[in-house]
Every structure is written in structure tokens, then in C-alpha cells.
Amino acid sequence: MTAQIIDGKAIAQSIRTTLKQKVTQRRQAGFRAPGLAVILVGSDAASQVYVGSKRKACEEVGFESQSFDLDTETTEAELLALIDECNANPSIDGILVQLPLPAHIDDSKVIERIRPDKDVDGFHPYNVGRLAQRIPVLRSCTPMGIMTLIKSTGIDTYGLDATVVGASNIVGRPMTLELLLAGCTTTTCHRFTKNLEQKVRQADLLVVAVGKPGFIPGDWIKPGAIVIDVGINRLENGSLVGDVEFNVAAEKAAFITPVPGGVGPMTIASLLENTLYACEQYHS
């Protein structure tokens, strides 16, 4: 068996095209374009690349993007004050604060300062709680994008054994909630998990998000499984690889996401979808 590649790049581009059409229709009907505030603190190279991609995507679909690039020395109080300004600005529908933040700033305090109806990253406890209660509104972008990828396979998720490897607030935990909502019997693995191999081998649907190259050996994959690899790791030779041993896994799985070009583009597409949703449902 050779797995079908789930082309996140193509699916994300299709979403962007649809969003661009919706923004054009809004403008033609006399409504404003959605507005997204993107806040970057410090000069972390990877964060600058991610923020650049998000700003470019906003421009492509016709959103109004406001950029705030702050020095590493910016205080927590200064950042919170900027968030308050964005919360009060009626032309801003979504607020994105690029993580990680410098060590002297409390991530949780910053996330909770963003109004839940402008939390287009889907990190606010209110929005995560809505997902846990099975009434999601603004959903965490990476898990939301992954669900779109899974739906693209045409596989019915109800009753599938799903395993999530990684329990971060950004991916693993909300991913578990998304899969429960989709009718899966879901196991979440973390650093204290015993017999990880067994739990991976039983998975009809496997999502891996640990940030370690080749962490899951390809021969652990259940034949016919769907494999979603969230990891993006740069090796010493400059190449990018995921958390799953791709070449071996691709011989056993039915569907698999590549790295790059799988989950990454979908995270940004979901951010754009959330921003339009916030604009239409809450602010316009």
C-alpha cells in the first residue's frame, strides 16, 4: 500500500480563493473587509517568518492587516495596553499575538486579555471551553485545519480509534476535543504515557505534534491509517522533516500529510476563516 498524500497546500489555496470571493462580495454589498491585528514581540527568526506568512495571506484574500512589531524589551504592561487598544478598535475583528513571547511576559495573561470574540487563534479559555462543551465558535487554528484535511479524505470519523501524540495547549489538547466532537474514540499521549508504541499501533487516525524529527517510527503505523504529521523540524542539512518517519509510514498508511505542505498551510487558512467568522458573526 502506498498512501495518498493529503495536499494541505492545495486545500488551503482553495479556502483562500473562497475567502477572497467572500471579501469581494462583502465590499460590493457595502460592508468593510475583515481586519486582523498581528502583534510580534522580539526578533525571533522563526516567528518573523510565520508572521510574514500570515500578513501576506491577509493581503491575498483582501483583509485589512494591521502590524505591530514590538521590541524584545517591551513590557508585559505595554503589550496588554496594546491589546486593550485593539480590543476597543471596531475595525479590528481578530487579534493575533505571535507565540512564543519573551520569557518576562506571561503567555496566559496575554491570551486571556484578548476579547474572546477577537481571539482568532482560538486559544482563549472561553473558546477552548466552548469546544469542550461541543458548541465551538472560534476554534484553535491548527486542529481546525487538521479536521478540514481529515474531511478531505472522505473517511467517516465516527467510531475511529484516534491517537494524538503530544498534549500542548496549542495543538494536542484542542485536537483531542475536535476528534471527540467528530465521534472518535480518542487517546492522548504525552511525556508520561507508557507503551506509546501500542497506542500508536492501534490508531486508525494518528495525529503527531511533538516537534522531534522522526519521533514515530514508520513501522508503528497501522495499515490503512490516516496519518497527520504536525511537526516541522529543520535538520542540519537544511531539509524539513516531520515527527513521523515519512517514507516507511507512507507505505503503510492510507492517507498521510507531507512536511512541508501538509498541516502548515492549513493553520493559516483556518486563521483567515476565523477572522472572517469573527467579522460576520460578532462585529459586522
Curated annotation (Swiss-Prot):
EC number: 1.5.1.5, 3.5.4.9
Family annotation (PANTHER family): C-1-TETRAHYDROFOLATE SYNTHASE, CYTOPLASMIC (PTHR48099:SF5), C-1-TETRAHYDROFOLATE SYNTHASE, CYTOPLASMIC-RELATED (PTHR48099)
Pathway: One-carbon metabolism; tetrahydrofolate interconversion
Naturally occurring in which organism (per UniProt): Shewanella frigidimarina (strain NCIMB 400)
Record key words, sorted: Amino-acid biosynthesis, Histidine biosynthesis, Hydrolase, Methionine biosynthesis, Multifunctional enzyme, NADP, One-carbon metabolism, Oxidoreductase, Purine biosynthesis
Organism classification: Bacteria, Pseudomonadati, Pseudomonadota, Gammaproteobacteria, Alteromonadales
Chain positions recorded as NADP(+) binding sites: 166-168, 232
GO BP: L-histidine biosynthetic process; methionine biosynthetic process; purine nucleotide biosynthetic process; tetrahydrofolate interconversion
Name of this chain's protein: Bifunctional protein FolD
InterPro entries: Aminoacid_DH-like_N_sf, NAD(P)-bd_dom_sf, THF_DH/CycHdrlase, THF_DH/CycHdrlase_cat_dom, THF_DH/CycHdrlase_CS, THF_DH/CycHdrlase_NAD-bd_dom
Keyword flag NADP: yes
Parts of the chain that traverse the membrane: none
Catalytic activity field: (6R)-5,10-methylene-5,6,7,8-tetrahydrofolate + NADP(+) = (6R)-5,10-methenyltetrahydrofolate + NADPH; (6R)-5,10-methenyltetrahydrofolate + H2O = (6R)-10-formyltetrahydrofolate + H(+)
Subunit description: Homodimer.
GO molecular-function terms, A-Z: methenyltetrahydrofolate cyclohydrolase activity; methylenetetrahydrofolate dehydrogenase (NADP+) activity
KW Aminoacyl-tRNA synthetase (keyword) present: no
Disulphide bonds in the chain: none
Gene name of the encoded protein: folD
Domain of life, per lineage: Bacteria
